[in-house]
Swiss-Prot record:
It comes from Teredinibacter turnerae (strain ATCC 39867 / T7901). This is Large ribosomal subunit protein bL12. NCBIfam families: L12 (TIGR00855). GO terms for molecular function: mRNA binding; structural constituent of ribosome. It comes from the Bacteria. GO terms for biological process: translation. The gene is rplL. Forms part of the ribosomal stalk which helps the ribosome interact with GTP-bound translation factors. Is thus essential for accurate translation. PANTHER family: 39S RIBOSOMAL PROTEIN L12 (PTHR45987), LARGE RIBOSOMAL SUBUNIT PROTEIN BL12M (PTHR45987:SF4). The keyword Ribonucleoprotein applies. One of its GO terms (cellular component) is cytosolic large ribosomal subunit. The keyword Membrane does not apply. Homodimer. Part of the ribosomal stalk of the 50S ribosomal subunit. Forms a multimeric L10(L12)X complex, where L10 forms an elongated spine to which 2 to 4 L12 dimers bind in a sequential fashion. Binds GTP-bound translation factors.
Length: 126
């Protein structure tokens, strides 16, 4: 009769710490694995995720949150930044929040944000 996982866990829970250590060593020897290696591999994976999030973002999206009071000036700025026609630029401004440009470098995104804000828009970089 095979033991269930629950039975095995209950048996381990009743063992002393020394018995558990001996059990782990016996399992490592029998199956040719190392519990320390599994922990060492898992730890950097979690660290890499945090490091990736901590790295500086290199691509930015310029998002028009709202046109503000000077809608005509914002439409002109959107046309200048995107190269869109009047109808498309107006639709983008009317549909705010909307993404004006995607995947820009930090400098280009800051320049576009500054131009739109000077025209009266509220802008976010994502």
């Amino acid at each position: 009769m095979a033991l269930s996982k629950e039975d095995i866990l209950n048996a381990i829970a009743e063992m002393s710490v020394m018995d558990v250590v001996e059990l782990v060593e016996a399992m490592e020897e029998k199956f040719g694995v190392s519990a320390a290696a599994a922990v060492a591999v898992a730890a950097p994976a979690a660290g890499d995720a945090g490091a990736a999030a901590a790295e500086e973002q290199t691509e930015f999206d310029v998002v028009l949150a709202s046109a503000g009071e000077k809608k005509v000036n914002v439409i002109k700025a959107v046309r200048a930044i995107t190269g869109l026609g009047l109808k498309e630029a107006k639709a983008m401004v009317d549909g705010a929040p909307s993404t004006v440009k995607e995947a820009l470098s930090k400098d280009d995104a800051e320049a576009a944000k500054k131009e739109l804000e000077e025209a009266g828009a509220t802008v976010e970089l994502k």
